[in-house]
Amino acid sequence: MPIKNIATFFFLIFALSGCTSLYDTFVYQIDVTQGNYIEDEKLDQILLGMSQEQVIFILGSPMLIDQFDSSKWYYIRYIKPGGEPIQQDKVVFTFDNLLLTDIAREGTIDINPLIKTPKARNVPNAATEDPSTSDNPQTDNDTPVIVN
């Protein structure tokens, strides 16, 4: 009888160990990035009327070309940073006679959440502000640093 109780106890321990919510807090989860890296600078270079070859030269190959309508190209970027919510950015290019006619963008990615950017310094505008009243006073040897 005690062996049956011990076996039941271990069975319950192993069965209930799969029902834990500690997975998200204690287990390391890698950052997952898939798809095309869509930079605003490169997207600003795309103009209506460009050919498909010019778009490929600037942004690279699209993630998806619609099977039923080959005039639509999808550039999709998917990010899942660790245990945080999934973010997705999508840009759809529509072509007519091999020329770009429409650009549609939707998504939740503002900046790359996987890259930690340093805080930008407040550099006073010499024409409108007095440098001595800024957050970071400069001496004659300091050069203003602008962080992208």
Curated annotation (Swiss-Prot):
GO terms for cellular component: Bam protein complex. It is a lipid-anchor. Its main location: membrane. Residues 120-148 are annotated as: Disordered. GO terms for biological process: Gram-negative-bacterium-type cell outer membrane assembly; protein insertion into membrane. One of its GO terms (molecular function) is protein-macromolecule adaptor activity. Residues 130-142 have a biased composition (Polar residues). A lipid is attached at residue 19 (S-diacylglycerol cysteine). Gene3D superfamilies: 3.30.1450.10. Disulfide bonds: none annotated. It comes from the Bacteria. The keyword Transferase does not apply. Part of the Bam complex. Belongs to the BamE family. This is Outer membrane protein assembly factor BamE. It comes from Psychromonas ingrahamii (strain DSM 17664 / CCUG 51855 / 37). The lineage of its organism: Bacteria, Pseudomonadati, Pseudomonadota, Gammaproteobacteria, Alteromonadales.
